UniProtKB/Swiss-Prot annotation:
UniProt keyword list: Hydrolase, Magnesium, Metal-binding, Nucleotide metabolism
Family of the protein in this entry: Belongs to the dUTPase family.
Enzyme kind, highest EC tier: hydrolase
Name of encoding gene: dut
Name of the protein in question: Deoxyuridine 5'-triphosphate nucleotidohydrolase
Gene Ontology MF, one: dUTP diphosphatase activity
Length: 152
């Protein structure tokens, strides 16, 4: 069963020239988001540009959130990743989805109208409440971190 999520189309080319984000395969975790630009743009090495996706969503369910993640091929082949590394969309956010596009590569990258730029993944959320303690119960790891377990 799929969870219904409200979506607004902010760019009329979505649904006519470009499809609404959807899962590419039955096993896909993410839906591709497109660069809904007015014209193609070149992203210089080291440059970060905010790109509209042409949609807004309202998750509405506080047990869910959406995350915007980079597409693996763009990052590996061209150095195109997210400027904020991960975009977190809270369940009560209703504004436009934007992608912070960062060229961490050494060559300029041209982004065309409608290019698939990032992916949208829905994840479960647990809202925690802190419980103040003076000491933690012992664990096998304790305070070990940052390389504590080695690489082999």
């Amino acid at each position: 069963m799929k969870t219904p999520i409200e979506v607004k189309i902010l760019d009329s080319r979505i649904g006519s020239q470009f499809p609404l984000p959807a899962y590419a395969t039955p096993g896909s975790a993410g839906m591709d988001l497109r660069a809904m630009l007015e014209t193609s743009i070149q992203v210089a090495p080291g440059e970060t540009i905010l790109i509209p996706t042409g949609i807004s969503i309202h998750v509405a369910d506080s047990s869910l959130a959406a995350v915007i993640l980079p597409r693996s091929g763009l990052g590996h082949k061209h150095g195109i990743v997210l400027g904020n590394l991960v975009g977190l969309i809270d369940s009560d956010y209703q504004g436009p989805l934007m992608v912070s596009c960062w060229n961490r590569g050494s060559e300029p990258f041209t982004l065309e109208i409608g290019d698939r730029l990032a992916q949208l993944v829905f994840v479960p959320v647990v809202q925690a409440e802190f419980k103040l303690v003076d000491e933690f119960d012992n664990s096998s790891r304790g305070e070990g971190g940052f390389g504590h377990s080695g690489t082999k």
